[in-house]
A protein has these predicted regions:
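Glycine- and aromatic-enriched mobile tails/lids
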Residues: 55, 62-71, 75-80, 90, ...
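Proline- and acidic/polar-enriched loop/turn elements at helix boundaries
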Residues: 30-31, 144, 333
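A generic structural signal for short coil/turn motifs at secondary-structure boundaries
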Residues: 1-2, 115-117, 183-184
């Protein structure tokens, strides 16, 4: 996604690699977006601020027209609505032209009791320090409003596993954010840390047990040579799109068409565009010809996998014709009890994505 709290090196490779290996994936449409992230400077765009509850009990959100717009989205919980609701509200206000001139919303903590600000600053010291650096000490001390935008944050969907982290491929284990189904359609704050502790331990124990009884398979030399040849393709291409440009096109497409607010038409357009990007992937050109420490070659390899992961997300989002948790369809805005099911993706004999609902 073009706006994300994650580091640039986190490109979703695990989902695509597991799919290629024959593993099933579950609920890939469940992508979490946080309501508050830094809009500027460009080097910090999308970086985590968090949620409204971190800025006092009387925090308020305003659009560029001075409206407290959460009255429209959740008049009872207002700024303390769940993160998906507030992120969607922030996105909608900006998308429909009611944001500030910088296409942001305003977080206003000024009606809080400022004697409490120290307690809150301790709870999220890094974010408060970054707010002070970006917007000034007054914003960090609840004396002035500051700007924010929503940002992609986490994947609830992922590789389908059992309680011992086994996938549907023999001896392939998975845990953490690469796995899916642990958090359902939404994730509570802090549970990702619990997840990696619990399932990381289970995966490690199961891997050790498998290793004791499973002989190591030898990789055929020709497979290794073929993999090396694939990495050379991008150095030999002369006229292709630079991988960085291709990546930007993909990320913008995902934000615009498979982002916080989705629709059937947008998802169809996204899948067609992703098919074009997939055909283009082998033709991207690393202009840097160095064979070592070549960032462009790495980006070219990552791009192929990013496109595949993006197709998995868009395919699953198109299949789920309802809104649930982090997945919101403006053409199906209500939660449908009949959809209390999982979308399962797997690789078909023609390498295409097979969809099942269970």
């Amino acid at each position: 996604y073009s706006t994300s709290t994650n580091a640039q090196c986190l490109t979703g490779d695990g989902y695509a690699l597991a799919f290629d290996a024959g593993a099933e994936l579950v609920d890939m449409e469940m992508v979490q977006f946080l309501p508050l992230a830094f809009p500027r400077p460009s080097t910090m765009r999308g970086q985590l601020i968090g949620m409204c509850s971190l800025f006092g009990p009387n925090v308020k959100l305003y659009n560029g027209l001075g409206e407290r717009y959460m009255l429209r989205y959740d008049p009872e919980k207002l700024e303390y609505a769940t993160r998906d609701v507030v992120a969607r509200a922030n996105y909608t206000e900006i998308q429909e032209g009611r944001g500030t001139r910088r296409k942001t919303i305003l977080v206003d903590p000024t009606e809080n009791d400022r004697s409490c600000v120290g307690t809150y600053r301790v709870s999220l010291a890094v974010a408060y320090d970054m707010i002070a650096e970006t917007f000034g000490e007054k914003a960090a001390n609840w004396e002035a409003a500051f700007e924010a935008i929503p940002s992609q944050h986490f994947m609830m969907g992922g590789v389908r596993i059992d309680e011992d982290c086994r996938t549907t491929v023999a001896n392939l284990l998975c845990c953490g954010e690469a796995s899916g189904g642990v958090h359902g359609a939404n994730r509570l704050a802090g549970n990702a840390l619990t997840e990696i502790l619990v399932f990381g331990k289970r995966a490690g124990r199961k891997a050790a047990a498998i290793a004791r009884t499973t002989p190591v398979k030898q990789i055929h030399p020709e497979m290794a040579r073929a993999a090396v040849r694939q990495t050379q393709v991008y150095l030999n291409n002369q006229d292709g799109v630079p991988p960085g440009h291709a990546r930007q096109r993909l990320q913008t497409l995902m934000w615009d068409k498979v982002g916080i607010v989705r629709s059937g038409d947008d998802l169809e357009q996204a899948l067609k565009a992703l098919s074009r990007l997939e055909r283009m992937a082998d033709g991207v050109a690393a202009r840097c010809r160095m064979r070592h420490w070549n960032r462009e070659r790495l980006e070219a390899l990552e791009f192929r996998l990013m496109v595949k992961t993006a197709k998995l997300i868009a395919t699953s989002a198109r299949e789920r014709t309802e809104s649930r948790g982090s997945h919101y369809r403006r053409d199906f805005p209500e939660t449908d009890p009949a959809w209390r099911r999982n979308v399962i993706l797997s690789k078909g004999s023609d390498n295409e994505i097979k969809v099942a609902v269970a």
